[in-house]
């Protein structure tokens, strides 16, 4: 059966059976990746959400054959604040708007849940991520020295205030 990719992507919550594919992306994206156990714990917490961006694959006959995970985003919702913990895109899907799609969906869900603030930390050296967050109107508000203890790198603390439109 021939399989071809559809040009659109979808977002859904991660399930336990997605873990192997998500771990492949995590290992490809980071020098010091999270462990599978950390992902399992995030799946168990009520306040934690792991969104995955999937690329549906169709058969030559036009039916849905399977899906491939293109990226993921992990966030916590605590009271009226969303904290983004981890964002990664599969190297084969980079520069295709996957992270932007995940960020937009996270913000939509944050607003729907009544959140008023979004926060995150990012490596000072991660220029691509800093640019992405700035396009979403995040602003730097501080530095956490040696936050990334693996290499002694500082984290830039960024925030975005959410405004509801009525």
Task: Label every PLM stretch briefly.
Residues 2-9, 13-94, 103-113, 161-165:
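Acetyl-CoA-dependent GNAT
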Residues 20, 37, 130-131, 149:
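Alpha-helical elements of the RecA-like P-loop NTPase motor core of helicases
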Residues 39, 129, 144:
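Acidic, amphipathic alpha-helical patches
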Residues 46-47, 80, 126, 148-154:
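Short acidic/glycine-enriched loop/turn segments that link adjacent beta-strands
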Residues 86, 90-104, 108-113, 117, ...:
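Conserved glycine-rich acetyl-CoA-binding loop
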Residues 100, 153-162:
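Accessory recognition modules or surfaces
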Residues 119-121, 134, 139-157:
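Conserved catalytic-core motifs of GNAT/GCN5-like acyltransferases
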């Amino acid at each position: 059966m021939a399989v071809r990719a559809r040009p659109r992507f979808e977002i859904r919550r991660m399930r336990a059976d997605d873990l192997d594919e998500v771990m492949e992306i995590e290992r490809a994206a980071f020098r010091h990746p999270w462990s599978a156990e950390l992902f399992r714990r995030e799946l168990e917490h009520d306040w934690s959400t792991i969104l995955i961006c999937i690329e549906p694959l169709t058969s030559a006959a036009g039916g849905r054959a399977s899906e491939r995970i293109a990226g993921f985003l992990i966030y916590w919702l605590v009271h009226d604040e969303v904290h983004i913990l981890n964002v990664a895109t599969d190297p084969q899907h980079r520069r295709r708007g996957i992270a932007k799609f995940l960020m937009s969906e996270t913000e939509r869900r944050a607003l729907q849940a009544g959140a008023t603030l979004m926060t995150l930390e990012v490596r000072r050296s991660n220029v691509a991520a800093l640019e992405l967050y700035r396009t979403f109107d995040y602003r730097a508000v501080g530095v956490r020295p040696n936050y990334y203890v693996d290499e002694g790198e500082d984290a830039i603390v960024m925030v975005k205030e959410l405004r509801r439109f009525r």
